[in-house]
Amino acid sequence: MPSRTHIVCLHEGAKGRSIDPVFINALLKALKPAWAQLWKGSNVVRTVPCGGRSNLIAQMPGELRNCLAMGADTTLMVWADLDDDMEDGEKLKERFWTTAKQEGITKEQFEQVVFVFAKDRLENWIEFLLTGKTDESREGPRLKHNEPVARAAKELAERCRSGAADSGFPSSLAWSCRNWRALRDRMKK
């Protein structure tokens, strides 16, 4: 049974202190992307805690080079929070591009990265997915247990699989879903 990383997910936060890996793993397991063979016990998804946003931005070019060197269908996903200083995902993506370009990453290589940016935090998405509402102008409530995190991720996967329109989604969730769909469409080619 092959065991190979197909999706590398960089995220903010410290190991053991972030809900991001729980949400990421539950979401990707439930989505079952066709290009990532999710065998039982395989490590096709690798989450990498990067601390704060500056560290995440600095680490991304090296991880992208690693993914490109692995070849095949290895995908780099970057999960981050859109804090008060970032209006939308495109502005934060531009900060990543500035650093990547300085590190010798081409635009074509950069465009292979899937960016997933939650405003104000991932907890806002979880609040929306579990209750149907959230206010992205404030931080969503902190979560102490993994069960609601995994349940929200599975709810999002179900909406993605069913092709449910993302109207009504918080703006950052709709933006991130479009990025996922672009990856999915690219992998079908």
Each language-model region and where it sits:
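C-terminal accessory helical subdomains adjacent to catalytic cores in phosphodiester-
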Residues: 1-6, 18-48, 54-189
